[in-house]
A protein has these predicted regions:
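N-terminal beta1-alpha1 ligand-phosphate binding loop
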Residues: 1-27
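Conserved RecA-like P-loop NTPase ATPase core
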Residues: 5, 67, 101, 134
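Short hydrophobic segments within beta-strands
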Residues: 6-8, 36, 99
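Short glycine-rich anion-binding loops that position phosphate/pyrophosphate groups of nucleotides
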Residues: 11, 71-74, 102-105
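Short, surface-exposed alpha-helical segments at coil->helix boundaries
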Residues: 17, 21-24, 50-53, 108
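S-adenosyl-L-methionine/SAH cofactor-binding core of RNA-modifying enzymes
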Residues: 32, 36-96
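A mid-sequence interfacial segment
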Residues: 86-124
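Structured adenosyl-cofactor binding patch, chiefly the S-adenosyl-L-methionine
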Residues: 108-152
Length: 153
């Protein structure tokens, strides 16, 4: 299954980018994980959300399953994430798109159109850290599915 992460922002600090790449490489046997960075907009919040959301929508395909990382989304455990991904894999979807909006999030139209809204935590993190946490959690979910000792909670 292909997983594409659409992120608003820039590449960022090398140490974060390197760690994200490490988890991305580790996942390649199970998922084809790719990261697409889209430019952020330095306008007032409402206009920035609209322009950034339009850029995200332009990258979506009609049959994509879409998850939005959003502080108002549902929080789940790592084993629940593993199960959710396995269910998608078993249903034969071609591509899961995980969306990380800009500093002000995404517009309501995009938020309301996604398949699922997911919150990594009640805490707010910098975008680069969100990418790293997401990459690690996708890897952890895969390891849970494989019965690996990586996850031992």
């Amino acid at each position: 299954m292909k997983i594409t992460v659409l992120c608003i922002g820039r590449r960022g600090q090398e140490d974060y980018a390197s760690a994200v790449q490490t988890y991305t490489d580790r996942l390649q046997g199970s998922y084809k994980l790719s990261w697409v960075l889209l430019a952020s907009c330095a306008l007032e919040p409402t206009k920035a959300k609209q322009i950034e959301s339009d850029a995200i929508r332009a990258k979506l395909k009609p049959n994509d399953t879409t998850w939005l990382l959003d502080e108002r989304g549902q929080q789940i455990s790592s084993p629940e994430l593993s199960s959710k991904l396995q269910t998608l894999k078993n249903t034969g979807i071609s591509r899961l798109v995980i969306i990380i909006g800009g500093a002000y999030g995404v517009d309501d139209s995009l938020r309301n159109s996604v398949t699922w809204q997911w919150s990594l935590s009640k805490l707010v993190f910098p975008h680069q850290m969100v990418r790293l946490i997401l990459a690690e959690q996708l890897y952890r979910a895969d390891q849970i599915d494989r019965g690996s000792a990586y996850h031992h909670a």
